[in-house]
Amino acid sequence: MGRNKKKKRDGDDRRPRLVLSFDEEKRREYLTGFHKRKVERKKAAIEEIKQRLKEEQRKLREERHQEYLKMLAEREEALEEADELDRLVTAKTESVQYDHPNHTVTVTTISDLDLSGARLLGLTPPEGGAGDRSEEEASSTEKPTKALPRKSRDPLLSQRISSLTASLHAHSRKKVKRKHPRRAQDSKKPPRAPRTSKAQRRRLTGKARHSGE
């Protein structure tokens, strides 16, 4: 009875066998495809660098555009203020004509608008003469029309763009260095002599014999 129980237990403990099968094509591709995968990784890295470079350039263009619009708006405001000052400071001219039977008389009245005297701008009256007043008015009209200074570029963006371009140039230089030795070897080979036919060789040998005789 004990022996039968042991036999039954041994039969129950058996497990199904595992069979491992290898795909020869995939195995060969894995063993021989190291160079191929390396080239693919390089291509992917170059494409990623190009995409990052495009994004940085796009950001830089947008920032420049925003700065240009801001500077243009400030300049337009300054020009509008200068036009208003010119309109207030300009001279007021009136002319009246009187017709007579023998001649015509024209009476012209010119009156300058003194902003400092009327305290329209809140300025104190100047102590000097008319020459000083005209110089001050000219300087006040010229100051708002000066060109505004440009803002400096973002140094972080320029550094990123320069680093990305340097990495791209390094990849291109490696490719050029690998291609040059083959050209040098091809250039060192001596030129091959042109092939001649049997009839040409016979003619040449016949001429040599006649010249020897």
Curated annotation (Swiss-Prot):
The UniProt function text for this chain reads:
Multifunctional RNA binding protein that plays a role in RNA metabolism and DNA maintenance. Participates in the resolution of DNA stress and the maintenance of genome integrity by localizing to sites of DNA insults. Also plays a role in proper nucleolar organization by limiting nucleolar size and regulating nucleolar number. Mechanistically, regulates the nucleolar levels of fibrillarin and nucleolin, two key players in pre-rRNA processing and ribosome assembly.
Pfam family of this protein, just one? Nop25
Where are stretches of biased composition, namely Basic residues? 170-182, 198-213
What does UniProt list as this organism's lineage?
Eukaryota, Metazoa, Chordata, Craniata, Vertebrata
Outline the segment boundaries, as ranges, of region: Disordered.
Answer: 118-213
* Family stated for the protein in its record: Belongs to the RRP17 family.
Subunit structure comment from the entry = Interacts with KIAA1191.
Coiled-coil residues are 33-96
The record's subcellular locations are: Nucleus, Nucleolus; Nucleus; Cytoplasm
Instruction: Give the matching InterPro entries.
Output: Nucleolar_protein_12 (IPR019186)
Keyword Coiled coil assigned to the entry: answer is yes
Q: In which domain of life is the source organism classified? A: Eukaryota
Could you list this entry's UniProt keywords, alphabetically sorted: Coiled coil, Cytoplasm, Nucleus, RNA-binding, rRNA-binding
Gene Ontology MF term list? identical protein binding; RNA binding; rRNA binding; single-stranded DNA binding
The main location is: nucleus
Q: Does the keyword RNA-binding apply?
A: yes
Tell me what this protein is called.
Nucleolar protein 12
Any GO CC annotation of this UniProt entry:
nucleolus
